[in-house]
Amino acid sequence: MPAAFIENRTYDEIAIGDSATLTRTLKPEDIQLFAVMSGDVNPAHVDPEYAHSSMFQEVIAHGMWGGALISTVLGTEFPGPGTIYVSQTLRFSRPVKVGDTITIRITCKEKFEHNKHMIFDCLCTNQDGQKVIAGEAEVLAPTQKIKRERYELPEVTISDRWARYHRLIARAKGLSAATAVFAHPVQAESLQSAVAARDSGILRPVLVGPEKELRAAAEQSAIDLKLCRVVNAPHWRAALAQALDMARSGDAEIIVQGAIPTHEFLLPLIASLRTDRRLSHALYIDVPSYPRPFIISDMMVNIEPALEDKVEIVRNAVDFAHIMGIAEPKVAILAGVDTVMPKMRATLDAAALCKMADRGQITGAVLDGPLGFDNAVSPEAARGAHLNSPVAGQADVLIAPDLEAGNMLAKQLEHLADAVSGGVVLGGAVPVVLANRNDSIESRVASLVLALLVANHARQPRKELR
């Protein structure tokens, strides 16, 4: 813990040969913060792919990161508060890489009584004792004693939103593009996501709707539809019927909702695409405060699912988790409390689902419930509640008790927790992407990537259904 006070050493208190040191270990966040603060986005510091091909073969610190640490010693300790920089020279001998531990040593070299200036040798060495930076600083030293309470620095959280988004998009790399039919995409957001997915090689979009209206919307938003197939349909009902026909005939692997009310969109969808599974929605969500992405289901399709419906929701979510690379997902069945309460149906359903998993009726995952949201995602909360299970505090899948709870949970995370997310409807003949008027283009494209992953999985030889 840092000292409670910050105190200087005056000109008269420092003798030639006196020194002070500071030791820091370079973390990736240090490089990111320095880039944000300075605007220095030299790819040698911020682009791992570029850095790998550079002479140093990995990301290195900005040179002035070490210079800033020299300034830290001079300004906070030796001499400390009241010090004014006059000049600084630096010579860089070798790069500082992530994980390097750097020791900064500042040594008094000369003093000038007439103007209270001092000259310091500045040396930065790494954990192997190798010199990385050397230089000389001249300062106007303080002549009056200063002792102040140390300022408590605010916590800084780095939003790696774009990195998390691109990690998700990268999952489509190497996969063959899928034909996706967009039903009545007459608003700019639908068209933009279709074109973005096309340009990324994710999809071959087919736009079904009133052609004049589609092209007018595209022209108004400067969207190029030249490489998109457009199928004329006079209204949204005809567009949806055409989309469903394409899915049933195998001409489309994905259906995407356009400007069609969700309840009007889902009813014919369920009737036309239902298999031996119940349709359910899964949201793949990545928040910076959780160590890995997780899945929430169901927030869009099943309003008040009965126990038998939840069995299918869990099975769909588990299959989806497998597609996303989670070999044995930890599934938390959410409720308002962690104990079985006869008057709370969500707790009874949770207990029944877990027993079904124990008996092999639900396989491919580890289930626990009922669990509150806090005890599902927080190891500290789970320990405090004395919940000892492989799921508590580290869930990969959250099964909401009903649509309202799932929807509110997901939207809270999306709007208040800097979440990157995408969703897909599972259990049908083809994956389906639902549209929300508040979805960003990145969220829409993320959903299309998820649909591609599900469609690609469907291309593989099917395993026996559980």
Give each language-model segment a name.
Residues 2-16, 97-159:
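HotDog/MaoC-like acyl-thioester-processing domains
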Residues 2-83, 87, 146:
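Hot-dog-fold acyl-thioester-processing enzymes
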Residues 17, 34, 63, 70, ...:
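Buried hydrophobic positions in well-ordered alpha/beta secondary-structure cores of metabolic enzymes
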Residues 21-23, 89, 134-138:
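Well-ordered beta-strand positions in beta-sheet-rich domains
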Residues 72, 92-94, 108-110, 126, ...:
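A residue-level detector for short acidic-glycine micro-motifs
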Residues 76-100, 104:
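Mid-chain, well-packed structural core segment of small domains
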Residues 93, 123, 334-336:
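Short loop/turn motifs enriched for small/polar and acidic residues
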Residues 158-206, 211-391, 396-466:
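Anion-binding alpha/beta catalytic cores of soluble intermediary-metabolism enzymes, centered on
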